[in-house]
């Protein structure tokens, strides 16, 4: 989601000290963040994107959640005010979860099947595609079924020894609990055409009956199997098929089967918006067109379930379990009242009472005449004008009849979903699934601040607590902290996407807010106005408290006064995302500047010099590090290699060594240099954090620390004052490691 809100906080006084005493990674949170982009939910809790939920068929306290990049979690007290979640898959090779379902043929409901997929709203970034994950002990342990490795698993069904998976390559089926799979799509005997198979639906009452949507190729449509997926028959009619083939085809199709055998289908068109919802009483023709839910905003402008046009990722559907006429649909975000009207401004409330860009969900009643079928499931359609986070991903009905919904903010519950009397509650509890793409440490007050995908910019409320507070909502920017100039005060910079509402705040050592300014970014010396990147890299200066570098879309800008005024110093564009390849200032030289643009390395020696290109790396530069006491020592990483220079970046030697061959870390993401008698270079990747020493030529690598899940570590920061390594992960929030420089910080493997 790309909408936002700025929040003014009453900041709490800190408790002193936040230092780990061993080589164990420590999770800081968020778990959850407060003041997020939800409405009339206690504390306005958000945690991060959850792609799939599985509700226990008979026990409303048991709920599983598959986070987009945070692994599988389980709660045994889902009906509590603050459910307690347990992480289950941290040691697996990927935490990118696409789907999870119970096996209805297991009478004890101990068997679950899940699949890996990359579905992050951050460009679908994610970890390895391992295949399927299966548990037979209520999630306590999981087996990786690798026969479908490297496939996006978009739907799963477990029926004893029979496993069925809908993937980007079609439908696969196993009859031996996943040891081997057969591709059914495109095989004449199966009845399924070749093409991407999106979603897989069934019902516990008739476990042998399955439905799948084929969403690419020439045979798009809805197909039904009555023999647990062995053979399939097209059941969609000409109208439904035509919709799925309209334009460039459906971007997404979701299915849900009710207890009476009724089937609902939701189709997203090639514009990323819900194009149609259909119902069949028994899974065969005829299919009744239920239209699409809409609200009327200013000047009669109509908006459906996807004002943001993000239906390719954000769509959910669930049939009601007791009323065969009811269906629930989730889209992306609320529209503001004047959206689509030139010059109207983006103001709330909208027509249903939404005051923010929160969740957009509806209830459909097929027994009603056209024009009366759809009712909001949020705001005016609730008893308390509540709404979950935007960008819905999955739905399930729990054993008590509540609607459980997952989205880019976490997991939420709608009580009494069949009426307007209920409301939305947070089930996030201590779930930690925040996707940080930027992170910074404040050594003065011992706080972390991070920019996250869709849950905004958040910061630690108090050391020792997992609760964070939202600074701004929407998509977080690249936060940075200046904490070197003083031991009693610090300055934090933060924004939302496109450097929106860049904020400069100063804090004392007790985390008390002492100033609050929106810098003007006024161009000087004939510089053009700054044009931000979606994710705009920032860098504070190592040697000067008020200097700032901004990596804009139209060049590199320098500020000498904290962003009040800016000067363009280069037209090159700093590479955005991941490690932010920019170093600004070294010991005794505030004018030093080094940055990466594509595969090219640019440098300014000091304030008297100009920016020039000095080298080209083998691929796009992901991150840079410099020994600030000796600027001739420079490090650079690409996605697959590590490089070392001893002449200030003019020439590099590859020091990747055994990092890739021994540890298979996946894509390299970020790095940090740690000075000392035997300096360390630390590199973060899709799977783990690794370290090499100067005494070994920075080319012999080891795993750093223990206890870190196999999550994408998106950004690293080393704080020399606290001797602390901070890791921002894409799916598990913020982590720290105290660097004691003892031998126990090195591990030979993951724990």
Q: Residue locations for each model-derived region?
A:
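Sec/Tat signal peptide C-region and signal peptidase I cleavage site
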Residues: 16-20
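Ser/Thr-rich, Pro/Gly/Ala-heavy low-complexity intrinsically disordered linkers and tails
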Residues: 747-750
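Beta-propeller blade termini and top-face loops
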Residues: 21-741
